[in-house]
């Protein structure tokens, strides 16, 4: 670690226990044990001039005027590492803009679930594969203490969705599912608008006792995303002791304690929910313990930060695989079609507003 002097970390770094702040917070603490670390807002207009022993690592942004994207074009970096969520779904909307900067990066530390890594070779991003390092998310169990001692009786199990209503969360399907099963309690934390068939609980601070007390009343966390990299709420639910129920398109598959639900057919989804209503308490407790073991052994910040440190110190910098004309055209179209496209008036307005706020703060 003597070859690197300073790490420029482009990531939100705050005191919140939710992502993205908690990612930046834990990374900063880990990196400062070995390097001088400077942090930046990932959506700010800024160009970093690299020192001869400096590393640029962090969150790229759809807008080309942002700090990571503009700084990555500068010569002289010891290493350039993208570190951001990755969802290689067929639409390509989440990450298509990365085509403009991936070649400048030595590696892409892709925060995503194993299900998406399994689909990468069939996606529009297949030529990125040599540069990608799979980086599973993490939670601190002290921030999300175990609270689910007992489950509701068979037939009275309750389902909780935690999240927003953006396109990738597929909440319209969740509404259909809840309406098809009016006898089952489906609730939502994360907003104040109404979702058909779900009880709206508003927004809550999960560090507060009243939020934990409310969550304790539920048995399953449900998320039916259609293009969701790997929602942190799944790991948070595991820590609390709830059993996650998620679509494969939410990033996780092959974990016995994370129950998958199909989203291609509503009847199959209804069948899955009805089956979960009759699972024994003993089986739920078994899944609960398997999930806690997963958190202790893998989905933790020591493992996460160790992977990042390894890539900072590595000299491996593979080229992209050969891309087809279909790949090129697909990603070009996806960037323009994406709801996150930087040139959309609403997105550009938010970008300017945010940077005016940063400019004002810097003058104080």
Give the location of each predicted region:
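A short, active-site helix/loop in glycosyltransferases that binds the activated sugar's phosphate group
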Residues: 92-96, 103-130
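Conserved catalytic-core segment of nucleotide-activated headgroup transferases in glycan assembly
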Residues: 141, 152-200, 205-206
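A charged, aromatic-enriched C-terminal amphipathic alpha-helix characteristic of glycosyltransferases
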Residues: 281-343
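Conserved acidic donor-binding segment of nucleotide-sugar-dependent glycosyltransferases
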Residues: 258-267, 275-281
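Acidic anion/phosphate-binding donor-loop and adjacent secondary structure
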Residues: 92-93, 133-156
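Aromatic "clamp/platform" in nucleotide-sugar-dependent glycosyltransferases that forms part
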Residues: 226
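Short hydrophobic beta-strand element within catalytic cores of glycosyltransferases
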Residues: 242-246
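N-terminal pre-catalytic "stem/leader" segment of glycosyltransferase-like enzymes
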Residues: 1-62
């Amino acid at each position: 670690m003597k070859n690197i002097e300073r790490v420029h970390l482009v990531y939100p770094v705050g005191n919140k226990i939710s992502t993205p702040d908690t990612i930046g917070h834990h990374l900063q603490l880990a990196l400062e044990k070995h390097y001088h670390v400077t942090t930046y807002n990932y959506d700010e207009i800024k160009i970093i001039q690299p020192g001869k022993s400096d590393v640029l690592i962090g969150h790229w942004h759809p807008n080309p005027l942002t700090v990571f994207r503009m700084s990555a074009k500068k010569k002289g970096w010891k290493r350039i590492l993208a570190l951001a969520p990755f969802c290689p779904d067929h639409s390509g909307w989440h990450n298509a803009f990365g085509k403009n900067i991936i070649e400048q990066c030595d590696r892409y530390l892709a925060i995503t679930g194993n299900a998406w890594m399994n689909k990468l070779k069939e996606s529009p991003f297949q030529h990125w594969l040599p540069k990608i390092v799979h980086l599973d998310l993490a939670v601190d169990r002290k921030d999300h203490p175990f609270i689910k001692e007992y489950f509701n009786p068979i037939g009275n199990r309750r389902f909780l969705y935690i999240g927003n209503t953006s396109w990738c969360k597929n909440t319209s399907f969740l509404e259909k599912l809840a309406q098809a099963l009016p006898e089952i309690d489906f609730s939502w934390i994360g907003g104040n608008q109404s979702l058909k068939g779900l009880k709206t609980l508003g927004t809550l601070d999960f560090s507060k006792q009243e939020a934990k007390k409310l969550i304790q009343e539920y048995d399953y966390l449900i998320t039916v995303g259609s293009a969701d990299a790997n929602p942190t709420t799944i790991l948070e639910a595991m820590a609390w002791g709830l059993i996650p129920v998620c679509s494969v398109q939410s990033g996780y598959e092959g974990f016995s304690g994370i129950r998958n639900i199909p989203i291609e057919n509503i009847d199959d989804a209804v069948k899955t929910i009805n089956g979960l209503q009759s699972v024994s308490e003993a089986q739920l407790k078994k899944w609960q313990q398997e999930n806690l073991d997963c958190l202790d052994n893998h989905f933790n910040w020591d493992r996460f930060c160790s992977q990042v440190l390894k890539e900072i110190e590595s000299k491996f910098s593979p080229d992209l695989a050969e891309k087809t004309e279909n790949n090129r055209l697909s990603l070009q179209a996806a960037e323009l079609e994406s709801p996150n496209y930087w040139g959309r008036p609403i997105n550009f307005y938010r970008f300017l507003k945010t940077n005016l706020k940063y400019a004002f703060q810097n003058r104080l």
